[in-house]
Amino acid sequence: MSSSTPKDTVDTAETPKVKDPESQAWSDDKRRKFETKSKSEFYDPCQEAAQASYRCLFRNGGDKNMCGEYFQAYRDCKQEWTEKRRREGRGWF
């Protein structure tokens, strides 16, 4: 008879991705999508990180303490995106 303890269970939840070239905040593909969108259209290159944060909150019943890594991944993505846009010297619109 085996009982399941927290250390016996495997967490199959996704974890934030680490600096994968495909998930860069400001890749050439994301730059092209941002520059070709209409002015009234909203485009967030960090949408994947935002959705992962929401999924984490949903999985954990809204407990923000359980999702700190996801929030930090989103903040890092947003910061990287804004810094690259600033360095390029382009405006937001």
UniProtKB/Swiss-Prot annotation:
Residues 1-40 are annotated as: Disordered. Residues 43-85 form the CHCH domain. The keyword Kinase does not apply. PROSITE patterns: CHCH. Transmembrane segments: none annotated. It is found in: Mitochondrion intermembrane space. It comes from the Eukaryota. Required for the assembly of cytochrome c oxidase. This is Cytochrome c oxidase-assembly factor COX23, mitochondrial. It comes from Gibberella zeae (strain ATCC MYA-4620 / CBS 123657 / FGSC 9075 / NRRL 31084 / PH-1).
